[in-house]
Every structure is written in C-alpha cells, then in structure tokens.
Amino acid sequence: MSFERFFSAEEILIWRKQELSKGGRAVDLDWLLDIGGGLGWSTLQELKIFQSSFHKLDLSLEELSLIWMRHLSDQIPLQHLVGKCPWRDFELKVNSSALIPRQETEILIDIALKKVDAGLMKYGRWADLGTGSGALAVALARALPLWEGHAADCCNDALALAESNINTLTENANVSLHLGDWWEPLKPWWGNFDLVVANPPYIPKTHLSELDPVVRDHEPILALSGGDDGMDSCRKVIKGAMKGLRSGGWLLLEHNFDQSEQALNLMVDSGFLEVDFENDLEGVRRFGLALRP
C-alpha cells in the first residue's frame, strides 16, 4: 500500500489532536512523530508558527495512526512497533528479545569514560555483562575504538540483536560476543579486564505485577526480574568482578532506586576500594562503582 508522505503543518497538528483524543500521552505521540515519522522535536514545536509549511514524513499519517492505535489497544511499546530506539548519539534496533534501553543508563557510559580518561588509558579491555540490545557495548566500542570489547548475554536472541547493532553502528569494532551467564563465558579473560559495566535485572519478583503493562507484558521478564529481593544478578556481577577485573580495574553497575546501600555494601564486603555511587537523572542513587585493589 502506498501513502502520500507530504503534509502541511496544519494537517499534522489536526492529526495530532485527533490521535490524542483516542488516548495515550502527548509525549509518546510526539516520540512517534519524531522517531517513526522523522519529524524532529524542534520542527514539531515550529508547526504552530508556520502552519502553511509542508513536511515530508518517513511514514504517512495513516501509517502512524495504525501504529498509535496498536500501541493503545495492545499496549505494545512504540519502540517495538517502529523497531528502533534513539540512545546517546545513535539509533538502536530493538525488539522483544531484550530490554528497551533507558535514557538513564546513558549515565553509566559517562561514568565509564570519566574513569578511563582519569587513568589516561588508550588501550584496554572492557566487558558488558547482560548486553541485551548491545547499547552499552555499542557506546563503549564507539568511544574506545582501540580497546578490546566483550559482550555477554544468556539469551541467544538478545545476543543476535546486540551483534546486529554492533555491526551496524560501529566501524571495525573489536568486540567479541559470548553466550552465557554473567561472568561464566568470559573465564578465559578473568583477571584481565580494565572495565566492566552491567545493567542487570533488578526488579524484585513480587513487584513485577506492579509494572506498567507496556513493560510487564512486552519486555523480557528475564531482563527485569532480579529474584526475591531484586539483587540476585547484582550479587553475581559484583562477586565475579573480583576474579574478572585486573588490579586497578573498575566495576560500574546500575541497580534499582532503593538498592544503593545493598550494592555498595556488597562491593565493600567483596574487597573493592573507592566504592561510591552516582545519581540518575532524577537525583536518585542508581549506579555503584568500585575499584579492584
């Protein structure tokens, strides 16, 4: 089916009002116009001023309406319906095999690059445990092109998604992918990692039913559930890091909003030094960092 993809600002604004009358959040519909339709945020703000202007969309308004209605009726994430998600300075392919990358996780990369810069390390070896879509791995490969990278996940489909994103979004990246549980597939390199990042599942299983249906029913439970207290995977990552990291290597971990004390205590008890935390975009303790002695 072929649709016309040139629309006036007035047509787009009328369409937007009609679609919002069906339900949903304005911020989500604007996201769809931006990422699905190719109408940038700044252009969207200008429509009210320049209503006689014309704009070419990547998808027609009819096609965007079909996506919006499916999002509302089936509560499927818009990212899954359009098959992509912007993250940092690139756009990831996404599907139901892996968690949709969250904006707050970008901070983990910022922390990592600060630690690398502080150590003036041009060469090194990093690992991304539970890589999922490969968001962290792609970001590290792009920022540290001379480093050797390793991305691991226990889900074959997620690993295939990560491989696709790494191949598409990095140029000649030296990244190896491994199938297995956390540190286990990286045994041959234990004691030789300079940097390890992880965003493991950390939702207590008793809280899963409280999640938004868009998340609960369409993102993999394997990437959400952290066991009884939400810390099962965090424990494995932290305890394994003493074997996996070299002396002077950094562990950077994302955890739930109320798990900072537990995570930092685990790091201290495991023998790490310079144990500290960083806040997320809302000012909440979300990241634990520690140096292997």
UniProtKB/Swiss-Prot annotation:
Matching Gene3D superfamilies, A to Z? Answer: Vaccinia Virus protein VP39
* Biological process annotations from GO: methylation
Give the protein's biological function.
Methylates the class 1 translation termination release factors RF1/PrfA and RF2/PrfB on the glutamine residue of the universally conserved GGQ motif.
> Carries keyword Flavoprotein?
no
Gene Ontology terms, MF aspect: nucleic acid binding; protein-(glutamine-N5) methyltransferase activity; protein-glutamine N-methyltransferase activity
- In this chain, substrate is annotated as bound at N199, P200, P201, Y202
Q: Which family does it belong to?
A: Belongs to the protein N5-glutamine methyltransferase family. PrmC subfamily.
**Is the keyword Acyltransferase in the record?**
no
In Swiss-Prot or TrEMBL terms, this protein is called Release factor glutamine methyltransferase
According to its UniProt record, this protein's enzyme class is transferase
EC code(s) of this entry: 2.1.1.297
The UniProt annotation places S-adenosyl-L-methionine binding at G130, T131, G132, S133, G134, D153, W182, N199
* Keywords in alphabetical order: Methyltransferase, S-adenosyl-L-methionine, Transferase
Reaction(s) catalysed (UniProt annotation): L-glutaminyl-[peptide chain release factor] + S-adenosyl-L-methionine = N(5)-methyl-L-glutaminyl-[peptide chain release factor] + S-adenosyl-L-homocysteine + H(+)
* Sequence intervals crossing the membrane: none
